[in-house]
C-alpha cells in the first residue's frame, strides 16, 4: 500500500492519498514478471508543494533556480547527482559573447555564425535572443565571481573557436570565446552553485526523477521522484516545472559524456505523450582521445593546434581553405573520417588522426591549456610539449531535445498551431531544443545556451505567475502508473542483465548512426534498435531493495536511453538529405525545399511516430533581418 505523508511549503500540500496494491494495467505490464504471486509492495509517498521545481542542477538548472529564487519563488531543485558533479563541469573551451575584447565584434555577427553553423535549421528568433543576451550573460557571470582568464589590460580573454567570423563571414576569424583557461565549465558550475546556495533554493540531492505529473487538461503539475538514499517516493507539485536534465550521449558506445548523461528529462517528456525534436542531429566532436573518448577542447585548435594525417599534411586546408582547423565541428569530423577512410589515418591500424600542440610555446600550454596537458598525459600517455595527441571524432552533444520557444516554454503541435505551449512545463540547456543549434552546434555556444535560457525560464515564470499562487490539487491517481511500473521493474526477473542490453544499444548506435549514414545502415539500425527495446522486456534486476539500488537506477536510465536512441534512429532514417551533423552518403545535398523543418518524434505504444514543424525564419524585431539560406562554406 501507499503510505502518504503530506508536507506543506508556502501552500498546503495536496491531501490526496491513494492505495497501491500491485496496481494493474501499468504501461509495461506485459514486460515484467515479479517472480512472486504476491505483488503487493509498500511505498512511502511524500508530497511537496513549491512554486517551481527545477529538475537537474547543471548550469541550466542552477541558473534557472537562481533566477526563480531572485524573483521570490519558492523553488525546489531535484538532482540525481551532487550539483557540482553535473556534466557542465566537463565543459572546457569557453562561452561565446560578442564582447569585443580582442577585436571589434557585434552580436549580429555572432548570430550569423550561429545560423550558418546550424545549417539553417536553427530558429532565428531564438538565436537572435541568445546572441543579443550573450554579453550581458557573461558580464553577469563575471559579477557572480567566475574567474575568467584575462588579457594584460585586465579584460576577459577571448580565444578563437570554430565556425566564428567577423562581419558576417567576410572579416576573418573572430575571437569571441571567453574562457577560464580550459576549465570553463568547472569554474561556471562552482560559481553558479555558490550563487544558488546564497539564495533560498531547496535542494533535493540524489533524487531520481521518474515521470512528469500531467493533469487531464494537458498541463504539467510537477514530477514524481525516487529518493535513492532511503527509497521513499516524492511527488513534487508545482505551478512550473523546468527540465534541465542534459543530453543522452551514453546511448553511444564512445562519448565524451559522463555515464550519467542518459536523457532522463527527454524520456519523461516522451512518456507523457509529448514530442522530442531533431534527435537525429548528434554532434561528433573532432577531438576525443583515441581509445578513451575523453574530450580535447576545441580551444586547443583555437590556441593554434593543428590536425595532421599520416603524411604529416595539414589536411583541413583542403576541406576548409579559409577556416582550416577551425571550421565547424561537423565539417572537421567528416574531414577526419574521410582521411581515415582513404588510408591516411595514423597509428598501427591507421584509424585515427594526430592533433599537434608541440609547436606551441610551453608557457602558452601551461597558461591557456593546463587541463588538456594533464588529460593527454593521463589518458593518452602523451607529453603535449613533445608529441601529438591521438584523436578521433567522438559523440559529444545532442542538438535535439525537448522543443521550446525562446522563453523556454515547452511547445507541441495542437491542431493548426505548431507552437502550442504546454502549461506548466519548461526546459533549458542540452535537454531543450530552442532551437539555437539547429543541425550543428558551434563550439562554446552550449555554455551560453544554458545560462541564457536558464535565466529566460526564470524570467518567463515571473512574467506569467506570482509567488505563492494557489495550485490545483494533484489528480487522484497522480503517479500511480509510475509506481506500478517502478514496482514491476524492480521485481523484474528476466534473463538479460541491464549492462548486456545497454552495450547492445550502444554498439547499434555507434555502428548505424555515426558520422556518415546510409539508407542501408539506418534501416538496419531501426530494426536493431526496435529489437533492443523488445529485449528490455527480458531485463533482469537482481537487487530488490529500495535503498541505494544502483541496479534499479541503471535500469531506469537504460529505459530512458532506449527511448532517446529509438527516436534518434527513426528520425535519421526518415530525413533524406544531408544537413549539419546528419550526413547521408546517399543523399549528399541539403534539400531546403523539402527538409528545412524540425523533426518531431513521439513515443506512442512503445513505437516511434514522426511529425514535423516549421523552422522559425523570422527574427524577433527590426534590429536584424532574417539570414536566408545559402551554401555553407568555411
Swiss-Prot record:
Its cofactor is FAD. The keyword Hydrolase does not apply. FAD binds at residues 56-61, 79-94, 264, 430, 446-447. Residues 1-32 form a transit peptide. Gene3D superfamilies: FAD/NAD(P)-binding domain, Fumarate reductase/succinate dehydrogenase flavoprotein-like, C-terminal domain, succinate dehydrogenase protein domain, Succinate dehydrogenase/fumarate reductase flavoprotein, catalytic domain. GO terms for biological process: mitochondrial electron transport, succinate to ubiquinone; tricarboxylic acid cycle. It is an enzyme of class 1 (oxidoreductase). Ubiquitous. Preferentially expressed in flowers and inflorescences. One of its GO terms (molecular function) is flavin adenine dinucleotide binding. Keywords: Electron transport, FAD, Flavoprotein, Membrane, Mitochondrion, Mitochondrion inner membrane, Oxidoreductase, Transit peptide, Transport, Tricarboxylic acid cycle. Substrate binds at residues 285, 297, 396, 441. Its main location: mitochondrion. The modification Tele-8alpha-FAD histidine is found at residue 87. GO terms for cellular component: mitochondrial inner membrane; mitochondrion; plant-type cell wall; plastid; respiratory chain complex II (succinate dehydrogenase). Its EC number is 1.3.5.1. It holds the Pfam family FAD_binding_2. Flavoprotein (FP) subunit of succinate dehydrogenase (SDH) that is involved in complex II of the mitochondrial electron transport chain and is responsible for transferring electrons from succinate to ubiquinone (coenzyme Q). Component of complex II composed of eight subunits in plants: four classical SDH subunits SDH1, SDH2, SDH3 and SDH4 (a flavoprotein (FP), an iron-sulfur protein (IP), and a cytochrome b composed of a large and a small subunit.), as well as four subunits unknown in mitochondria from bacteria and heterotrophic eukaryotes. This is Succinate dehydrogenase [ubiquinone] flavoprotein subunit 1, mitochondrial. It comes from Arabidopsis thaliana (Mouse-ear cress). The gene is SDH1-1.
Amino acid at each position: 500500500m501507499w503510505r502518504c505523508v503530506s508536507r506543506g511549503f508556502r501552500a498546503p500540500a495536496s491531501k490526496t492519498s491513494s492505495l497501491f496494491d500491485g496496481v494493474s494495467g501499468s504501461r509495461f505490464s506485459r514486460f515484467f514478471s515479479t517472480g512472486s504471486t504476491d505483488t503487493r509492495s509498500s511505498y512511502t509517498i511524500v508530497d511537496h508543494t513549491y512554486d517551481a521545481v527545477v529538475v537537474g542542477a547543471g548550469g541550466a538548472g542552477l541558473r534557472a533556480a537562481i533566477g526563480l529564487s531572485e524573483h521570490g519563488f519558492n523553488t525546489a531543485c531535484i538532482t540525481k547527482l551532487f550539483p557540482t558533479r553535473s556534466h557542465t563541469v566537463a565543459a572546457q573551451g569557453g562561452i561565446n559573447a560578442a564582447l569585443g575584447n580582442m577585436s571589434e565584434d557585434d552580436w549580429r555577427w555572432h548570430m550569423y555564425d550561429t545560423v550558418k553553423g546550424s545549417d539553417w535549421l536553427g530558429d532565428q528568433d531564438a538565436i537572435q535572443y541568445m546572441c543579443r543576451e550573450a554579453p550581458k550573460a557573461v558580464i553577469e557571470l563575471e559579477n557572480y565571481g567566475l574567474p575568467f582568464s584575462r588579457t594584460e589590460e585586465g579584460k576577459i580573454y577571448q580565444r578563437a573557436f570554430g565556425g566564428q567570423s567577423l562581419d558576417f563571414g567576410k572579416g576573418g576569424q573572430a575571437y569571441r570565446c571567453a574562457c577560464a583557461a580550459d576549465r570553463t565549465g568547472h569554474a561556471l558550475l562552482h560559481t553558479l552553485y555558490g550563487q544558488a546556495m546564497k539564495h533560498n533554493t531547496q535542494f533535493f540531492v540524489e533524487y531520481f526523477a521518474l515521470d512528469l505529473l500531467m493533469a487531464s487538461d494537458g498541463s504539467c503539475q510537477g514530477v514524481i521522484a525516487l529518493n535513492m538514499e532511503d527509497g521513499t517516493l516524492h511527488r513534487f507539485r508545482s505551478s512550473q516545472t523546468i527540465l534541465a536534465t542534459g543530453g543522452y550521449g551514453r546511448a553511444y558506445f564512445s562519448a565524451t559524456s559522463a555515464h550519467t548523461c542518459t536523457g532522463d528529462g527527454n524520456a519523461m517528456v516522451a512518456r507523457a505523450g509529448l514530442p522530442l525534436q531533431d534527435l537525429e542531429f548528434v554532434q561528433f566532436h573532432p577531438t576525443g582521445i583515441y581509445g578513451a573518448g575523453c574530450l580535447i577542447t576545441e580551444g586547443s585548435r583555437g590556441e593554434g593546434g593543428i590536425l595532421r594525417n599520416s603524411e604529416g599534411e595539414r589536411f583541413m586546408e583542403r576541406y576548409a581553405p579559409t577556416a582550416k582547423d577551425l571550421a565547424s565541428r561537423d565539417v572537421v569530423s567528416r574531414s577526419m573520417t574521410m582521411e581515415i577512410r582513404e588510408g591516411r589515418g595514423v597509428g598501427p591500424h591507421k584509424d585515427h588522426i594526430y592533433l599537434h600542440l608541440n609547436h606551441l610555446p610551453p608557457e602558452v600550454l601551461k597558461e591557456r591549456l593546463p587541463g588538456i596537458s594533464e588529460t593527454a598525459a593521463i589518458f593518452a600517455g602523451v607529453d603535449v610539449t613533445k608529441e601529438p595527441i591521438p584523436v578521433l571524432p567522438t559523440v559529444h552533444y545532442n542538438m535535439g531535445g525537448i522543443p521550446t520557444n525562446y522563453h523556454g516554454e515547452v511547445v507541441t503541435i495542437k491542431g493548426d498551431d505548431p507552437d502550442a505551449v504546454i502549461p506548466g512545463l519548461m526546459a533549458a540547456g542540452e535537454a531543450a531544443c530552442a532551437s539555437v543549434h539547429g543541425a550543428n552546434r558551434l563550439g562554446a555556444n552550449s555554455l551560453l545556451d544554458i545560462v541564457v535560457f536558464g535565466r529566460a525560464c526564470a524570467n518567463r515564470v515571473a512574467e506569467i505567475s506570482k509567488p505563492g499562487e494557489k495550485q490545483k490539487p494533484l489528480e487522484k491517481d497522480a503517479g500511480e502508473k509510475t509506481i506500478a511500473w517502478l514496482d514491476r521493474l524492480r521485481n523484474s526477473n528476466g534473463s538479460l542483465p541491464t549492462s548486456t542490453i545497454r552495450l547492445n544499444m550502444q554498439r547499434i548506435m555507434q555502428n548505424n548512426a555515426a558520422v556518415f549514414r546510409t539508407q542501408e545502415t539506418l534501416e538496419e539500425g531501426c530494426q536493431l534498435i526496435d529489437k533492443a527495446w523488445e529485449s528490455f522486456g527480458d531485463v533482469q534486476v537482481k537487487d530488490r531493495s529500495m535503498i541505494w539500488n544502483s541496479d534499479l537506477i541503471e535500469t531506469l536510465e537504460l529505459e530512458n536511453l532506449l527511448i532517446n536512441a529509438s527516436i534518434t534512429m527513426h528520425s535519421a532514417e526518415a530525413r533524406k538529405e544531408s544537413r549539419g551533423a546528419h550526413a547521408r552518403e546517399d543523399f549528399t545535398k541539403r534539400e531546403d525545399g523539402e527538409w528545412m523543418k524540425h523533426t518531431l518524434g513521439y513515443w506512442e505504444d512503445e513505437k516511434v511516430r514522426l511529425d514535423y514543424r516549421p523552422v522559425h525564419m523570422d527574427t524577433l524585431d527590426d534590429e536584424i533581418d532574417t539570414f536566408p539560406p545559402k551554401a555553407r562554406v568555411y
